[in-house]
Amino acid sequence: MKKIAVLTSGGDAPGMNAAVRAVVRYGVRQGLEVIGVRRGYSGLIDGDFVKLEYKDVAGITEKGGTILRTSRCEEFKTEEGRELAAKQIKKHGIEGLVVIGGEGSLTGAHLLYEEHKIPVVGIPATIDNDIGLTDMCIGVDTCLNTVMDAVQKLKDTASSHERAFIVEVMGRHSGYIALMAGLVTGAEAIIVPEIPVDYSQLADRILEERRRGKINSIIIVAEGAASAYTVARHLEYRIGYETRITILGHVQRGGSPTAFDRRLALSMGVEAVDALLDGEVDVMIALQGNKFVRVPIMEALSTKKTIDKKLYEIAHMLS
């Protein structure tokens, strides 16, 4: 193998740049030519390629986002789109592809291998942390720290005004960020997609806390469980006083990656190049315990990852 490519796809996650840097520098050290694909699968279809040298990735580890840029490509979801992408790969003599992204991106990588035998290796990067068979995905730790910092600041104003704040965080199918943020900030309630919410019970809990002298409440809700506005409407009707809403939105995707995310990304990038050189393809690099392992992409994607319900119970006990 002499020439490989790397792309970032889907929603950006802090640490993607660190992974790109590792793939490029380690690849070059192994005697490979490394090509960067701009704009994810859209760039793959369009042939938007750039050769990346050692110096081109200097100073990017600490930067959020992705220097390669990213996109969500509807055309790639079609067989025709993937065929165009495969033709570009073969036309440019690319012998292996590293895909950095979440569920949709990794599915696309698998399909490239299944349909066109393009050697692919996936690196899980999504703040939702909803990819199976890996303990952590790139970007999760940074996102969690961003949410924690925001909630701590909201607690200051919530206590000053004796209010209930509802904080909506990302997590369409997974409540991981909501759960962990709620646990480490001492939120009074956590609402996640995996566990149905009982609004009457939630209201009773907040009212009981008020009777005990607690003057403020923080409720953290994952976007996939309910919107903050829906939660506010249900609560205000039951508790009889106004709430305030904060939707953190895309700020959760940004920022300089934490030390943990940098180390995770760098290690996964190196392991991805090694996997290609070893001929072990259609796999995803996963963190299991303290070890980096290679697992079949579709096995990872078909393994449902849920929150730790015992931890959920503990979070409410400690609030």
Curated annotation (Swiss-Prot):
Active site location: D128 (proton acceptor)
Keywords of the record: Allosteric enzyme, ATP-binding, Cytoplasm, Glycolysis, Kinase, Magnesium, Metal-binding, Nucleotide-binding, Transferase
Pathway, per record: Carbohydrate degradation; glycolysis; D-glyceraldehyde 3-phosphate and glycerone phosphate from D-glucose: step 3/4
Transmembrane spans: none
Binding site for ATP: G11, R72, C73, G102, E103, G104, S105
Annotated catalysed reactions: beta-D-fructose 6-phosphate + ATP = beta-D-fructose 1,6-bisphosphate + ADP + H(+)
Biological processes per GO annotation: canonical glycolysis; fructose 1,6-bisphosphate metabolic process; fructose 6-phosphate metabolic process
Free-text remark on how the cofactor is bound: Mg(2+). Mg(2+) can partially be replaced by Mn(2+) and Fe(2+).
Residues annotated as binding Mg(2+): E103
Documented activity regulation: Allosterically activated by ADP and other diphosphonucleosides, and allosterically inhibited by phosphoenolpyruvate. Strongly inhibited by diphosphate, triphosphate and polyphosphate.
pH dependence: Optimum pH is 6.7.
Binding site residues for ADP: R21, A22, V23, V24, R25, K155, G186, A187, E188, R212, K214, I215, N216
Superkingdom as given in the UniProt entry: Bacteria
Gene Ontology CC: one annotated term: 6-phosphofructokinase complex
EC number: 2.7.1.11
Residues bound to substrate: T126, I127, D128, R163, M170, G171, R172, E223, R244, H250, V251, Q252, R253
Thermal behavior of activity: Optimum temperature is 93 degrees Celsius.
SUPFAM superfamilies (alphabetical): Phosphofructokinase (SSF53784)
Cofactor(s) in the UniProt record: Mg(2+); Mn(2+); Fe(2+)
Coiled coil ranges: none
Cellular localization per UniProt: Cytoplasm
Quaternary structure annotation from Swiss-Prot or TrEMBL: Homotetramer.
Family indicated by similarity: Belongs to the phosphofructokinase type A (PFKA) family. ATP-dependent PFK group I subfamily. Prokaryotic clade 'B1' sub-subfamily.
Role, per record: Catalyzes the phosphorylation of D-fructose 6-phosphate to fructose 1,6-bisphosphate by ATP, the first committing step of glycolysis.
Protein name as catalogued: ATP-dependent 6-phosphofructokinase
Recorded name of the encoding gene: pfkA
